[in-house]
């Protein structure tokens, strides 16, 4: 997501060369349950259970936007929880809630290069900083003869 069409592999390579990591290349690497999926299923738990039933063994990541949804996702046993648009204090609380779980936490939404260190300090496992790919400065080059 949020990469230039046709350039995803190169952009993700650039992130790795800059010291970042990619925990997925495409959405086919696992199931990503977003807010619309949760709404359609009726609950976080139901959305997770449907994916587990249809795609046993697939890595499941679920997007949550509050701590109650986080607790529900942890109870349902997902691999990764994406904390969407949570501020630093909410993120710290999420890390505390999940501290005894094997589930990984990813902060996303509102992260910028300038505040990434503060989010990293909360103890989350992953930071989704979209600006690394969708807002990277362009290189002005020309082929003048």
Regions found by a protein language model. Give the residues of each.
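Short secondary-structure boundary segments
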Residues: 85, 109, 131
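Acidic/glycine-rich phosphate/pyrophosphate-binding loops and surrounding catalytic core
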Residues: 1-76, 80, 92-97, 102-106, ...
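Active-site loop ensemble at the mouth of alpha/beta enzyme cores that anchors a bound cofactor
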Residues: 142-145
């Amino acid at each position: 997501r949020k990469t230039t069409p046709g350039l995803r592999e190169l952009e993700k390579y650039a992130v790795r060369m800059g010291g970042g990591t990619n925990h997925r290349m495409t959405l086919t690497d696992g199931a990503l349950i977003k807010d619309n999926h949760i709404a359609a299923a009726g609950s976080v738990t139901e959305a997770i259970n449907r994916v587990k039933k249809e795609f046993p063994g697939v890595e499941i990541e679920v997007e949550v936007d509050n701590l109650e949804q986080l607790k529900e996702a942890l109870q349902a046993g997902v691999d990764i929880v994406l904390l969407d648009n949570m501020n630093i204090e909410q993120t710290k609380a999420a890390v505390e809630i999940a501290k005894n779980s094997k589930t990984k936490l990813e902060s996303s939404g509102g992260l910028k290069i300038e505040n990434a260190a503060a989010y990293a300090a909360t103890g989350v496992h992953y930071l989704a900083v979209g600006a690394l790919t969708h807002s990277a400065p362009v290189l002005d080059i020309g082929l003048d003869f």
